[in-house]
Amino acid sequence: MKQHSVGRVETKTFAINDKLKLSSGKTLENVELAYETYGELNTAKTNAILVCHALTGDAHAAGWHKNATKPGWWEIVIGPGKALDTDKYFVICSNVLGGCKGSTGPASINPKTNEEYALDFPIITIEDMVHAQKKLIEHLGIEKLHAVVGGSMGGMQALQWTVSYPNMMKKASIIATTARSSPQQIAFNEVGRQSIISDPFWNNGQYYGKNRTPRSGLAVARMIGHITYLSDESMYIKFGRELQDKDQLSYDFTLDFQVESYLHHQGESFVKRFDANSYLYITKAVDYFDLSVDGSLPDGLKNVKAKFQIIAVDSDWLYPVDQSKDLLTALQTLGVEVSYNEVKSDYGHDAFLLENGQMNFLLNNFLSENVVDDLMKTDVPTIDINSTIKDAANIMFDNQVTHLPVVDENDKLLGIVTAWDLSKSIAKDCKLLEDVMTKDVRYCKSTDSIEYISRQMKKFDISCLPVVNDDLCLEGIITTDQISHLISSY
């Protein structure tokens, strides 16, 4: 599958004309949101997808800024031929309220004082971020989104969208996140905040325009956070216990290990692009996030109407699989249409930003709903039920296949025989095909989604499914190899 970048892009600014009322009861004036768009909005305005960024992300999700050395943060899935195909969809991403990459936040000018807000900026929530995004979507003339998609804190925003504005999207893809922040997640954020607040140059948030800023505290906060984005396995693979630019231990407090050097690099790079006060405000918004009502998640989600996709990462210990499954259970309890997938990766939490093939496959299947008809093989060798086992072996050998659908004279599916069945027939001294074939065979329809049949094949440990019509007549087959090839094409 041929893929391209969206190319050169520019960040735009949307100004909210009226006051923005916040969850705290306070209001903000002159709010601006930085945003980028990719692709074209169709005439009916039905092809828009909102992408929500994670904690330290921004509006630059794809493409290249002028003189940039790297593309947007989700380049792997946004662009022509990718899951968020900009030849098909109009993709929108905005910097969150409280951010520092063009949207109004604590580093912005307070219209009442003509100075930076600093700690006069009100506490914000994920709900406030989404409320501001809604105004942007309305400004773009979009009444209903095709989908809202987000990972990590972006997944929280996507979830909040489904609760706050249930009629404004068809689909929601919720990735590597939770429906309510856990004590451990809150604890990590608090340690990060304290590292900033304890920096002597934080100066109670009043460091704008000064020569010294809380760079050290913000760098440590980033180092702490970055550890949670990785997995133990990924750190072993990337660093092991290798030393950094030395052959032996130094026996002092300089950097010995590569992993130490890496974390320092992450911290030093981060302070060049992020505001310390924004980090305080955004992590507090994450801590406050809880969609349950009186402890009940189903009660908090009872009004959602979107079709859901939940994607977890098997090595994610920041937002572990169990939290995604809690969300899945709550939605299933409500009878909401929902699918669940786990990305297999050593990368940890950051896998949703890095696993090109798996993320494109899962998102593409959900957003575009690829169906069996797109992949199935129609030129399929079959065998008559009255044939012998030797006949089956010859057909398999001649056609280099391991599965043979068994059909009658009208091509009606009667069963399936596999190479494994033929092996068993030798041990049991069977002669007739009917004695070894599977009669109660699982099958699918050409209109079934690839996502659905992938789950079925995994659940029942099946590598091949016959495809039948409404009369149970054979139309073709689909195999796990074909699905794997689709994944590898991204």
Swiss-Prot record:
Name of the protein in its database record: Homoserine O-acetyltransferase
Annotated ranges, domain CBS: 376-436, 437-490
Gene Ontology annotations for the cellular component aspect, listed alphabetically: cytoplasm
Keywords per UniProt: Acyltransferase, Amino-acid biosynthesis, CBS domain, Cytoplasm, Methionine biosynthesis, Repeat, Transferase
Molecular function in Gene Ontology: homoserine O-acetyltransferase activity
Domain AB hydrolase-1 positions: 47-355
GO BP: any one term: methionine biosynthetic process
Subunit architecture: Homodimer.
Matching InterPro entries: AB_hydrolase_1, AB_hydrolase_fold, CBS_dom, CBS_dom_sf, HAT_MetX-like
Record-linked HAMAP family: MetX_acyltransf
Tree of life domain: Archaea
Role according to the record: Transfers an acetyl group from acetyl-CoA to L-homoserine, forming acetyl-L-homoserine.
Cited SMART domains: CBS
Positions annotated to bind substrate: R222, D350
Catalytically driven reaction(s): L-homoserine + acetyl-CoA = O-acetyl-L-homoserine + CoA
